[in-house]
Amino acid sequence: MAKKRILSGMRPTGPLHLGNLHGALANWKEMQDKYECFFFIADWHALTTDYDATEPIRGHILDVFLDWLSVGLSPEKCTLFVQSYVKEHAELFLLLSMITPLPWLERNPTYKEQIAELKNRDLSNFGFLGYPVLQAADIIMYKANGVPVGIDQAPHVELTREIARRFNHFYGDVFPIPETILTESSKILGMDRRKMSKSYNNAIFLSDSPEVIQNKVGQMIYRPQRARRADPGNPDICNVFSFHQLYSDRETAEGIDAECREAKIGCVECKKMMAANLVKALDPIREKRSFYETRPDTVRAIIEDGNQKARAVARQTMEEVRAAVKI
């Protein structure tokens, strides 16, 4: 029995961080052993908000690929590619835009949220409004059976389903209707207790050196009410302890929990222990990244091979689409 096909992507915004690891990447790594997976770098999507700052995008593409390889995504198990290399995405996006009602895009909750969040940017362009149509083209191009996303992206997949149904209604059953595979969002917060994000300048990156990690952990905001060493702490609301739960062994985490509540351990010592365990956990990822950083030709070959595999599938799909639309 053929494996179900999965597709997901990431915008190239720079090196990836722990939030990416415990959100998408951990799920992708498991999925590559169970499904036929297509994972792509959505560089065209980056233009919807960064159309006036495109210079870093090519470098960011390489950063993301290095991080993908370093965490264990394997080109032997999945297809890794760059969206803009597969020009068929643009053609399918154009055709889908012809049949997508404008109100579908205007009522998209993610669109409204991003307009509010990025209120200092001029986003009054079709590319930003039509972002979900390009996303639909990305997904149905590969006839994906499922799309792993966090709850915030679920409306986009639902819109993709509606667009696929509408295309099939007009032109025949060309596309399967993809299912939403809800994945658990990362619970890791940034150093300032907000969502970990490059834009907030609060992220710990997978490529950070041990010294940088130790420095960032030292800056972490914990519970400000614990003003004195003798004050008991509350691990339940402590950002540092949430990292212990992920990166320290169970015995250590339980010991930290008890000692913090009884004020037997201070925050500085707690942070140092956590930083050491985090550095140790990320060592294999950093080592693998270093391996690929010194072999740029190998990385370029992996990217090119994935691009070719993806485009072969896309060409076949577009032949079917053109025949169905009769153009």
Q: Which residue stretches match the model-derived regions?
A:
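Residue-level signal for well-ordered alpha-helical scaffold segments within enzymatic catalytic domains
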Residues: E30, S70-V71, M98, I139, ...
